[in-house]
Amino acid sequence: MIKHYDVVIAGGGVIGASCAYQLSKRKDLKVALIDAKRPGNASRASAGGLWAIGESVGLGCGVIFFRMMSANRKREAQGSAVVVDSSTPHILPQSFFDFALQSNELYPRLHRELMGLHNMDFKFEQTGLKFVIYDEEDRLYAEHIVGCIPHLSDQVRWLDQAALRASEPNVSHEAQGALEFLCDHQVNPFRLTDAYTEGARQNGVDVYFNTNVTGVLHQGNRVSGVKTDVAGLFRCTTLINAAGAWAAELSLQATGIEIPVKPVKGQILLTERMPKLLNGCLTTSDCYMAQKDNGEILIGSTTEDKGFDVTTTYPEINGLVQGAVRCVPELAHVNLKRCWAGLRPGSPDELPILGPMDGVEGYLNACGHFRTGILTSAITGVLLDKLVNEEALPLDITPFLARRFATAPVKKQPEPA
């Protein structure tokens, strides 16, 4: 049986769900959200940080990633392990700052909307983010961050050791202070995806879980639908690729071009519930921590090039544990509830891939968000809704178009409609 929709969204993670929710508010579009429910979606590798500045300047799992990459490059160049110079922070382009900050600003209203209209609470909390400083290397890193973002000086605050202890009494005495980002907050990453999905469903979106897209249909240079393994054929006017770490495969099927999105493994762990231990989100050069509303603390996250592997490994989990205990010694006495791994959709420049592909109609990208999918899901949904409806965009997406990559098309016989 053939199903007919205006929009089919392939991928029901936080990005696809946000797109579905924003499109559903139109009421005049017929929308399908298709998700394979495969293990390893990117939300599983997230602590739910809305760290618009923190992630833009390479903190959170970004600082772990940057230090790993820097060490690897220096080993390749010098043939031996070296100390990474943390005085050169990994700053993303201004276009990403604009993208992330606009998304962050949407969350208070979005939270009220999903709570009020759909009774879905994704636990938005205004916590701030503190980069904990242990030594001179960390301080140099923080100073260079501040030097790179003078236009955001009102959103950062230095905390000396006494101020940090007053704000976070359980932080180690080893910490010399912190750099705090006042507009960076948090949500529950799993509840956020559920909230988008349920809001979309209540607004009339048809949701197909445990369903794989197995092929893409074409009429000339236009995408006209998809084939699935268990739900049959879907005809559509627009296909949105929100397939996360699997987006390259869908792009190849739809356009003949394999966009450069690959899985980046992130291991994370969760503690038992406990009384309030952290007043805000913390990030160090070893890990990040976020205590949720139920008392559990999420500790993350590794950044590994391991393909689609989602197994957990002792050395990496132990490294996160040691980093967390170094920052908050009380955690040495806490039980771990579980650990797991998720797959972030990484792109070569760490920026998302959004919008149309040259020469192909009826197809839009919404993928490649790497470590910032939770943060930027809100603005991505808004942008894709406006792209589908051919309306003016709230920001320029030129830096995020797939054409920035010199990717040659792969010859692939398109499936006819």
Swiss-Prot record:
PROSITE patterns, A to Z: PROKAR_LIPOPROTEIN
Swiss-Prot/TrEMBL keywords: Cell membrane, Lipoprotein, Membrane, Oxidoreductase, Palmitate, Signal, Transmembrane, Transmembrane helix
Residues that bind FAD: 7-21
Induction conditions: Transcriptionally up-regulated by Anr in response to Fe(3+) in oxygen-limiting conditions. Stimulated by glycine.
Residues anchoring lipid (N-palmitoyl cysteine): C19
Task of the protein: A three-component membrane-bound flavoenzyme that catalyzes the formation of hydrogen cyanide, a secondary metabolite, by transfer of electrons to a cyanide-resistant branch of the aerobic respiratory chain. Contributes to suppression of black root rot of tobacco.
Name of the protein: Hydrogen cyanide synthase subunit HcnC
Source organism: Pseudomonas protegens (strain DSM 19095 / LMG 27888 / CFBP 6595 / CHA0)
Taxonomy of the source species: Bacteria, Pseudomonadati, Pseudomonadota, Gammaproteobacteria, Pseudomonadales
Gene: hcnC
